[in-house]
Amino acid sequence: MGQQVLKSSNEKMEKAVAAYSRELATVRAGRASSSVLDKVQVDYYGAPTPVVQLANITVPEARLLVIQPYDKTSIGDIEKAILKADLGLNPSNDGTVIRIAFPALTEERRRDLVKVVKKYAEEAKVAVRNVRRDSNDDLKKLEKAGDITEDDLRGYTEDIQKETDKYIAKVDEIAKNKEKEIMEV
């Protein structure tokens, strides 16, 4: 019973860290990346549709993103959606493709992005700690029900704490790497 709680908590912590990594991918670090557009929804024939489903997105240069819509009539809608998403990007439309030049980040913008990274890191750590708390509660219920002994409870609780420390260290490492990437000029 206790092993199941351990396994479950491990999986949930892993998912929390993976979600954090995906979230960080959308933070612009001065280099062009198609993941910046992951959350952009285009009003396509009345239905909100992700840009990635409507166009081929390529990165021909380090600071340039090219969006080639499958349906040329949707080019205006895609451009509007990118502007509306307020990503600090200025798309230019030549009728067949949309080009987005990524300007070099200012020192102030870099600091703002580092703050965002730290905020996301804190949210990920909270998620990991919540998993720890829930798992410890589950273990206490098992002990109360007589399914595990008090010694087992202590051992499993220590194991969960070790896992928590491991995943929080992972979040810190990911955050440190992203901050370094952002602060590179």
Swiss-Prot record:
S-S bonds: none
GO BP, sorted A to Z: translational termination
Record's keyword annotation contains Ribosomal protein: no
A GO term for molecular function: ribosomal large subunit binding
Keyword field: Cytoplasm, Protein biosynthesis
Cellular localisation: Cytoplasm
Pfam families for this protein: RRF
PANTHER family for this protein: MITOCHONDRIAL RIBOSOME RECYCLING FACTOR PSEUDO 1, RIBOSOME RECYCLING FACTOR
Function: Responsible for the release of ribosomes from messenger RNA at the termination of protein biosynthesis. May increase the efficiency of translation by recycling ribosomes from one round of translation to another.
Database matches in HAMAP family: RRF (MF_00040)
Protein name as it appears in the record: Ribosome-recycling factor
Lineage, opening ranks: Bacteria, Bacillati, Bacillota, Bacilli, Bacillales
